[in-house]
Amino acid sequence: MKIETILSPSLFSQIEDIDKKVVVVIDILRATSTITTILANGASAVIPVKEESIAREYKSKGYLVGGERGGETITGFDFGNSPFQYKKEIVSGQEVVLSTTNGTKCIEMASSAHQVVIGSFLNLESVVNYIMHLDKDVVLFAAGWQDRVNLEDSLFAGAVASSFARRDCDDATQMARDAYSVAEGNLFETLQNTNHF
């Protein structure tokens, strides 16, 4: 298994043979953390959509819909993009539609992969255990912020990579891994000091 890391959506097109790889989409603040929370709170499914207009179509059909653009909750949606808004008593048993600036765009970009996995610090152990047992190359795909690299997504990529041998990782993965090793003991404070927190 080889692990490569894409630190910005603008680099995603450089991935070769994507249909043979597993892509872990990472948008720590906040889409993938929100998706993980929605599912942990009992939703039957999360439907990620890139376009706000498609999310509105789902809303008109009675679905619960959440999302943001530029960090602001979309007017008329049931929720924003904070995991804390998706309470168990509201989302349990429901299909929830989510549309965000960065994360859902990246999920759609990765849709031609062999498989797409959602990664957040909330499900880190599950993600690592899952991909560890696959016989597929893995792409850690950081959503970043507006096509730019961000620290929180890079740190998660590094956290995943720290469970694998360095020889199996490309340079970007090794950089993320090294950044994580520096921040690991003080992760929450490091995340609080990111531009996007």
Sequence positions of predicted segments:
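Glycine-rich anion-binding loop/nest that anchors nucleotide
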Residues: V139-W145, D168
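Nuclease catalytic cores that cleave nucleic-acid phosphodiester bonds
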Residues: V117-I118, L124-I131, K136
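Residues that scaffold, gate, or flank divalent-cation-dependent active/transport sites
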Residues: E4-D17, A31-L39, A43, S53-V96, ...
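Long, charged alpha-helical interface segments
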Residues: E72, D78-Q115, N129, L151-F197
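Structural motif
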Residues: I3-E4, K21-V24, S44-I47, G62-V65, ...
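Short, structured patches in soluble enzyme cores that scaffold and shape functional sites
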Residues: T100-T101, S120, A142-G144
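Conserved active-site and cofactor/substrate-binding residues in soluble primary-metabolism enzymes
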Residues: I26-S33, K50-S53, T101, L122, ...
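Phosphate/ribose-phosphate-bearing ligand recognition and processing surfaces
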Residues: A143-D153
